């Protein structure tokens, strides 16, 4: 509902939408990578419902999943048609401590033609 409301308000305007969320929190690296991969798979598939379902089913985690899903829904309603995952890493990739990591990902949502 929030995503569609955003789209309705923003229709006809030139906007950039931003959603920010950490991914997995304080899991071992291997578990975090699996959880993060599922959320990022849903993002890459432009599947906001999948982002929400991933956590409900224990297959993924994003603390800001609601904001992420809302922005994906808004972007779809505004005509975006492509998502590209740019990067994924964990805090363990930086610190070397793989026992408890936090996952991070970056993606862009694009519209292939300007209206």
Q: What is each of the regions a protein language model found here?
A:
Residues 1-16, 26-115:
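Flexible, D/E/H-enriched segments
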Residues 18-20:
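Active-site neighborhood of phospho(di)ester-bond hydrolases with catalytic His/Asp-centered motifs
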Residues 22-24:
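Catalytic metal-binding/acid-base residues of hydrolase active sites
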């Amino acid at each position: 509902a929030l995503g569609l409301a955003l789209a309705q308000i923003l229709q006809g305007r030139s906007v950039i939408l931003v959603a920010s969320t950490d991914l997995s929190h304080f899991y071992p690296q291997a578990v975090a990578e699996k959880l993060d991969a599922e959320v990022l798979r849903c993002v890459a598939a432009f599947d906001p419902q999948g982002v929400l379902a991933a956590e409900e089913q224990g297959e993924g985690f994003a603390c800001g999943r609601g904001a992420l899903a809302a922005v994906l829904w808004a972007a779809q309603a505004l005509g975006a048609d492509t998502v590209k995952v740019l990067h994924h890493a964990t805090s363990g990739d930086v610190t070397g401590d793989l026992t408890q990591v936090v996952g991070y990902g970056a993606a862009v949502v694009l519209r292939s033609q300007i209206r």
